[in-house]
Amino acid sequence: MAYYRTPHDVTALPAWQALKDHRQAMQDFSMREAFNADPQRFNQFTLSSCGLFLDYSKNLINAETRNLLVGLANEVDLKGAIKALFDGEIVNSSEGRPALHTALRRPVGDKLSVNGVNVMPEVHKVLNQITDLVGRIHDGLWRGYTEKPITDVVNIGIGGSFLGPELVSEALLSYAQKGVRCHYLANIDGSEFHELTQKLRAETTLFIVSSKSFNTLETLKNAQAARAWYLAQGGSEAELYRHFIAVSSNNAAAVAFGIREENIFPMWDWVGGRYSLWSAIGLPIALAIGMSNFKELLSGAYTMDQHFQSAPFEQNMPVLLALLGVWYGNFWGAQSHAILPYDHYLRNITKHLQQLDMESNGKSVRQDGTPVSTDTGPVIWGGVGCNGQHAYHQLLHQGTQLIPADFIVPIVSFNPVSDHHQWLYANCLSQSQALMLGKTLPEAEAELRDKGMSEDQVQKLAPHKVIPGNRPSNTLVVERISPRRLGALVAMYEHKVFVQSVVWGINAFDQWGVELGKELGKGVYNRLVGSEETAAEDASTQGLINYFRGRHRG
């Protein structure tokens, strides 16, 4: 029976008990000692695939740990789950849908059926539609209401319609096509809208409204504001079609807004928002970096799909990262995971992975609705490079919580300045090294004595300089951030999240928790503006409504 039809209690599996026993045996495991004892440890726990190099040797593991974790993957039938995902089975049980974001990067000629229909021709038809639009804009053939070419594209969307495209278009800024600037408008905050439109001219701006339903509150409000701004700047209703296109499955609503049918790019219910950057949601990416680079992005993701499906689990990058996350979250008590990119252009990867991981695996019931019996997804957080070293890395080094980390770093910078990149790379490696090595009390005391301190001073200060070490991390190295390697990197994290959902028996492809706040928000809004006089469901919310109404002006 498929994993999503009969979810298991993972804690009842023999492999889980074996890992519990192994965890006790690893209580006094020291990475420092493990490296000293085994000169081959680095070679034993590194892996290269799809343009990515993974060093996972700085983890609280040995060969037995890896074997036991792979045994757990086998007991939950991970192989069958991967096949179900790629074959288009109904892995999203609560919504009765497959999750086929991987279809978006499959090559021409592949076949994949959904409800008896081969979807691949439609996938490539839309890709051709994107190619045509991108070509017309880059060639200056798409013109605004004053017949000037488009110079700015604004993507109006939130969540998966924003985070993935923003990550990729900024990460690949070095591949940006001249003549077209891409911007993102997501939050329902007038200040964001104001600051953005200050930079734009309506006559040369194209808005992409990205919303599957064409009814997402934040997106619709921003689209309406953009429409009003366009008209106020001199645009006309008759020429509106030149300045607004849509990515949506609600054609009727988009047409009613003023968008022409031929300028509506479809979305499919078998692609979730946080997995959608490979689809027409990626239009701003293609406009930013060009169509050939966008196809390279898809190709890189496809190579990771192939690796994920074919590599043995002990040599499978997404599988190993997922199992390490299970190891720390379920057996070492880790509650969060840090993503630490040492690259300015990758500064938004943490935001994308927050949605990808936390919206997917922030679940407390299994696929069949029964409660989970163990912790599931961690809090994902982090930030870029050396900035974090002067902020929150202190907690990683000397705090009381175990927080695994992923360091992501390129070997080559697109913008070399003196020896900056060598220092950046050195800082990345030294941070992972410091997390692993730490500093013992005798080492701290010796260091202070070498500085000429009195013994009394040494004894007072040394405990503050002790760093526990033995803190786990992975290091992901790429030669240089390119469309292909970035595609592989993002797809790797998608598959990592899926593997963990299989282990825990949860649904990685729904997000019912997001819906409750939306539903309650309507009632709160109606009370704020006075169209609903009944009190809110609780005194705190009503009190805050009253506070707003008593003070709000304008």
From Swiss-Prot:
Superkingdom assignment? Bacteria
Instruction: State the top-level EC class.
Output: isomerase
Catalyzed reaction equations: alpha-D-glucose 6-phosphate = beta-D-fructose 6-phosphate
- Tell me which InterPro entries the record gives: G6P_Isomerase, G6P_Isomerase_C, Phosphoglucose_isomerase_CS, SIS_dom_sf, SIS_PGI_1, SIS_PGI_2
Q: Which family does it belong to?
A: Belongs to the GPI family.
UniProt keyword annotation of Amino-acid biosynthesis present? no
| Keyword Magnesium carried by entry | no
Q: Which residues form the active site?
A: 359, 390, 518
**CDD domains assigned:** SIS_PGI_1, SIS_PGI_2
Q: In which pathway does it act?
A: Carbohydrate biosynthesis; gluconeogenesis; Carbohydrate degradation; glycolysis; D-glyceraldehyde 3-phosphate and glycerone phosphate from D-glucose: step 2/4
Q: What is this protein called?
A: Glucose-6-phosphate isomerase
The organism is Pseudomonas fluorescens (strain Pf0-1)
**E.C. numbers:** 5.3.1.9
Where does this polypeptide localize?
A: Cytoplasm
